[in-house]
Amino acid sequence: MNKRVAIIVGGTGQFGISIAKLLLKKSYKIIITTRNLKKKINLKDKNLKINKLNIYNKNQIKNLFKKNNPYIIFFLAGQSSPVKSFKSKKETYKSNFLGCKKILEVIKNEKINCKFLNAASSEMFGKINGKIK
């Protein structure tokens, strides 16, 4: 039986490593993507790979997904620091929105049958008046 594959986009932080550890215990094959392969993570396993990925490059995304047939994709990339997000609004918009959008477009256009989780804060939507429908 083939192992289920989880791709953790931007998974070198605390949350990504925690997800990877949990899923490795459940016998998943894990692919963590990062923009910087120099960043070291303290996790080694025969079912874990670290891949460099440009989240704005649809061909790289498509190749990764087609090659690995993910069961689930976690999108953890992007700016997570509120202080930094206000200092570099364009980069925050690019990484948090456009990067996620590119991933979703590839999933849709290539008909990748997977679960998708975007870990984000409701703060990204700003102040909402009334109920969300």
Model-derived features: positions:
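N-terminal Rossmann NAD(P)H-binding glycine-rich loop of SDR-like oxidoreductase domains
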Residues: 6-26
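Conserved Rossmann-fold NAD(P)-dependent oxidoreductase catalytic core, especially the SDR/UDP-sugar
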Residues: 75, 101-133
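Rossmann-fold cofactor-recognition segment
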Residues: 45-57
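N-terminal Rossmann-fold cofactor-binding loop
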Residues: 33-38, 55
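Short beta-strand element of Class I
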Residues: 29-31
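Conserved catalytic-core motifs of eukaryotic protein kinase domains, centered on the activation segment
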Residues: 43, 83-91, 127-132
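NAD(P)H-binding glycine-rich loop region in Rossmannoid oxidoreductase-like domains
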Residues: 55-94
